[in-house]
UniProtKB/Swiss-Prot annotation:
Family of this protein: Belongs to the phosphoglycerate kinase family.
Residues engaged in binding ATP: K204, G298, E329, G358, G359, D360, S361
Biological or metabolic pathway of the protein: Carbohydrate degradation; glycolysis; pyruvate from D-glyceraldehyde 3-phosphate: step 2/5
GO molecular function, a single term: ADP binding
Phylogenetic classification of the source organism: Bacteria, Bacillati, Actinomycetota, Actinomycetes, Bifidobacteriales
PANTHER family: PHOSPHOGLYCERATE KINASE, PHOSPHOGLYCERATE KINASE 1, CHLOROPLASTIC-RELATED
Protein name according to UniProt: Phosphoglycerate kinase
Gene (name only): pgk
Any single Pfam family the record assigns to this protein: PGK
Cellular compartments annotated: Cytoplasm
């Protein structure tokens, strides 16, 4: 994989950078700027080298139309604050305003192009259409840096096709992500523990399949665990259940046994009369995992399981965690996710290499107040880190070889 140093001297050069600025917004307020901060090392390095830094990114799913609420204006403002410099936002991605703003740049300046997904060609399935569009963007720059790890699993105009038109390299964030995830999957120090949560088993099938012959231990919580409990013959009440995955999950339980992989499931769960919505009062109670009442829904792992999961994580040299253990946004159902996060922090302090897979787990550790430096690596890619852990070839990385 080519990296920044492969691009040579960048002084005075116009460098297009595909970043991942797909941040959560409340109106125009950014509620978690983790992805913006993650892009700063690459931006600062390019500025120090005297490059003209042209940033591009997407926000939300405007589906090829201009949606004012999904403008990157809040991102430009936040970037300006973090960099201590003005970051102008072009009104378009490659049109007149983008061209004019780029033409006016001095060495070390930063410009942000408007949301790439305002253009239908960005995510087009037609390769020729995407390539023609990418050429228009590429005309703005003289080199391309791919630093949006959150989109490397997609072949899209601004991260895949542009790389074919310009000298291309991975930015510091993508390089760091690939190093960290490779360290965990290629030659992990053992015991190697994988902790999986989140609502759906179907989202994690590939990861389970790929890691069943690599991990020493698979720890499972979150909504997806009820399909495992059901596969073991337990009743799960009104908990989330993917009936169509039961046979697959039974197969995983058998394979784990055959491969000598320790499969750790909760022994107790926190249940409630239903999913906590709006202002409905919650009445959580703890029940054994094999005794969930017919009218109750499991929403977190119980106290006994919290200790069990924590101890299994601490007894590891490499830990990869993807997906919360419960509905962590509701305080009554956050303890499981906290216990796992604390387990990773304690394991890291004891010398283990720990990765928090992006998406919900990354937001959870930030929202629950854990220090970012308590973990070896917090990934910025949800789907991308999952596909990397599945052992898939990622198009946005392949073009940088």
């Amino acid at each position: 994989m080519k990296t920044l140093k492969d691009l040579g001297d960048l002084k005075g050069k116009r460098v297009l950078v595909r970043a991942d600025f797909n941040v959560p917004l409340d109106g125009t307020t950014i509620t978690d700027d983790g992805r913006i901060k993650a892009a700063l090392p690459t931006i600062k390095t390019l500025r120090e080298e005297g490059a003209k830094v042209i940033l591009m990114a997407h926000l939300g799913r405007p589906k090829g139309k201009v949606v004012p609420e999904l403008s990157l204006a809040p991102v430009a403002a936040r970037l300006g604050e973090l960099l201590g410099t003005n970051v102008p936002l072009a009104k378009d991605t490659y049109g007149e305003d983008a061209q004019a703003k780029v033409a006016a740049m001095n060495d070390g300046d930063v410009v942000l192009l408007e949301n790439v997904r305002f253009n239908p060609e960005e995510t087009s399935k037609d390769a020729d259409e995407r390539a023609a569009y990418a050429k228009k963007i590429a005309a703005l720059g003289e080199a391309f840096v791919s630093d949006g790890f959150g989109v490397v699993h997609r072949a899209q105009g601004s991260n895949y096709d542009v790389a074919a038109d310009l000298p291309a390299a991975a930015g510091l964030l993508v390089e760091k992500e690939v190093k960290a995830l490779s360290k965990a999957t290629e030659n992990p120090e053992r015991p190697f523990t994988v902790v999986l949560g989140g609502s759906k088993v179907s989202d994690k099938l590939g990861v389970i399949e790929n890691l069943l012959d690599k991990a020493n231990r698979l720890v499972i919580g979150g909504g997806m665990v009820f399909t495992f409990l059901k596969a073991k013959g337990y009743e799960v009440g009104t908990s989330l259940l993917e009936e169509d995955q039961l046979e697959k999950v039974k197969g995983y339980i058998e394979t784990a046994e055959k491969n000598g992989v320790e499969l750790v499931l909760p022994t107790d769960v926190v249940v409630n009369a239903g999913f906590p919505a709006g202002d409905t009062p919650v009445a959580p109670e703890v029940v054994a995992a094999d005794a969930i009442p017919a009218d109750k829904m499991g929403l977190d792992i119980g106290p006994e399981s919290q200790k069990l999961f924590h101890d299994k994580i601490v007894d590891s040299k490499t830990v990869v965690w993807n997906g919360p253990m419960g509905v962590f946004e509701v305080p009554e159902f956050a303890a499981g996710t906290k216990a796992v996060a604390q387990g990773l922090v304690d394991a890291t302090a004891a010398g283990a290499f720990t990765i928090v897979g992006g998406g919900d787990s990354a937001s959870a550790v930030r929202n629950l107040g854990f220090p970012e430096d308590g973990f070896s690596h917090i990934s910025t890619g949800g789907g991308a880190s999952l596909e990397f852990l599945e052992g898939k070839e990622l198009p946005g990385l392949k073009v940088l070889e």
